[in-house]
Regions:
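Conserved N-lobe ATP-binding subsite of Hanks-type protein kinase domains
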Residues: 20
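Protein kinase catalytic-loop region centered on the HRD/HxD motif
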Residues: 112-123
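Activation segment signature within eukaryotic-like protein kinase domains
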Residues: 107-108
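Activation-segment/catalytic-loop signature of the eukaryotic protein kinase fold
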Residues: 73
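C-terminal lobe helix-coil module of Hanks-type protein kinase domains
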Residues: 169-267
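Conserved short submotifs of the Hanks-type protein kinase catalytic core
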Residues: 77-91, 95
C-alpha cells in the first residue's frame, strides 16, 4: 500500500487535469480521509502550485458542514498534497438516472444551499457539476457537500491565470464565452443543469453545453421541457428555464433562492398519478381471496 506522509492510500476517488484525489487511512487518528495530490507534471509550475495550496487554505477558511474541510497539508517527492474529510456517500454523478423526482429535487436543493455557503464567503465556484457535489449518506436526509475549489474565481484572479476553467456542459454562457465579468449567478446556471440532469438523466444542451454553440445560437437556444410523465410540477420546469436563461438577470439571483424555489414549487407531490385500473397482482390476489372464502364456506356448509 502506498504511503503519503502518514496517510495510507487505499484507492483513487477521482482525477482531473491538475490533481488526483485518493481515499486514504490516517493511522494516528484511526479515520478515513481524502487526500488531494497535485499532478506531477504541474508540480514545478509555481503559479499552479500556489493556486493548489490556496485552494487548501480557502477550504480551511470556510467553516461549514456543507463544504469539505481541510485538516492537513504536506509535500512528498516535491508534490504538495492536502488532506480533507472523506465523505462516504459517493457523488451526485452516481445518482444520475437512478433517483426519483422527489430525491432529485431534495439533492438539488441541498446542492444549492451548499453553493450559497461559498457565495456568502465571496467565493464563486465556477465548476459546479455532479462529480464535485458529495453525498453524505451519514446524515438523514442525505446532505450534499461541495468540493473542489480549484476553479474558484478568487483563486484564478489571485494567481493571474487567464485560462477559462470549468466543464463546458455546466458553464453559463457568460463564463463560456467570456463576455464580461460574471458572478454567483454562473453557479446558479450550473445548478440548473445539474437539476435537469438529475430529473431526466441527460444534460439540457448535450455534453458540450452551450459552449459548443456559436454565440448567436447560444443566445437563442432554450432548454427542452421536462417530460410530463415524470410527474414533476410545472413550476419546476419554469424554474429550470429561468435558471438556464442566457441573461443572468433572468435567473434566480442567488443559489439559496434557487434552492428555496425548488422546494416550494415542488410542493412535496412528486409521484406520477397512478392508474385507476387494478394491477395484475391485485387482480390475482383478489381471485385467490375469493377462492379461499368460497372454499371455507363450502366446507362449513358440509
Amino acid at each position: 500500500m502506498r504511503k503519503l506522509g502518514r496517510y495510507l492510500l487505499e484507492g483513487r476517488l477521482g482525477a482531473g487535469s491538475f490533481a488526483t484525489v485518493w481515499k486514504a487511512y490516517d493511522p494516528e487518528l484511526d479515520t478515513d480521509v481524502a487526500v488531494k495530490v497535485l499532478a506531477d507534471n504541474w508540480a514545478s509550475n509555481a503559479d499552479v502550485r500556489e493556486r493548489f495550496l490556496a485552494e487548501a487554505r480557502l477550504l480551511r477558511r470556510i467553516s461549514s458542514p456543507r463544504v469539505v474541510r481541510v485538516h492537513d497539508v504536506g509535500v512528498q517527492d516535491d508534490r504538495p498534497y492536502f488532506v480533507m474529510d472523506y465523505v462516504p456517500g459517493g457523488t451526485l454523478a452516481e445518482k444520475i438516472g437512478h433517483c426519483r423526482p422527489a430525491e432529485a429535487l431534495h439533492l438539488a436543493a441541498e446542492a444549492g444551499y451548499a453553493v450559497q455557503v461559498l457565495h456568502d464567503t465571496g467565493v464563486v465556484h465556477r465548476d459546479i457539476k455532479p462529480s464535485n457535489l458529495l453525498l453524505d449518506a451519514g446524515r438523514t436526509p442525505t446532505a450534499v457537500l461541495v468540493a473542489d475549489l480549484g476553479s474558484a474565481k478568487q483563486l484564478a484572479d489571485a494567481s493571474g491565470l487567464t485560462v477559462t476553467t470549468g466543464t463546458p456542459a455546466y458553464m453559463a454562457p457568460e463564463q463560456a464565452f467570456q463576455t464580461g465579468g460574471f458572478d454567483g449567478r454562473a453557479d446558479v446556471y450550473a445548478l440548473g443543469v445539474v437539476t435537469f440532469e438529475l430529473l431526466t438523466g441527460r444534460k439540457p444542451f448535450g455534453s458540450g453545453g452551450r459552449a459548443t454553440l456559436t454565440t448567436e445560437q447560444a443566445s437563442t437556444s432554450s432548454p427542452p421541457a421536462i417530460p410530463s410523465d415524470l410527474g414533476v410540477p410545472n413550476g419546476i420546469d419554469r424554474l429550470l428555464r429561468a435558471a438556464l436563461s442566457v441573461d443572468p438577470g433572468d435567473r434566480p439571483q442567488t443559489a439559496q433562492a434557487f434552492a428555496d424555489a425548488l422546494l416550494s414549487q415542488g410542493g412535496g407531490e412528486w409521484a406520477p398519478a397512478r392508474s385507476s385500473r387494478p394491477t395484475r397482482l391485485v387482480v390475482w390476489l383478489a381471485a385467490i381471496v375469493v377462492y379461499l372464502v368460497t372454499a371455507v364456506l363450502t366446507w362449513l356448509v358440509r
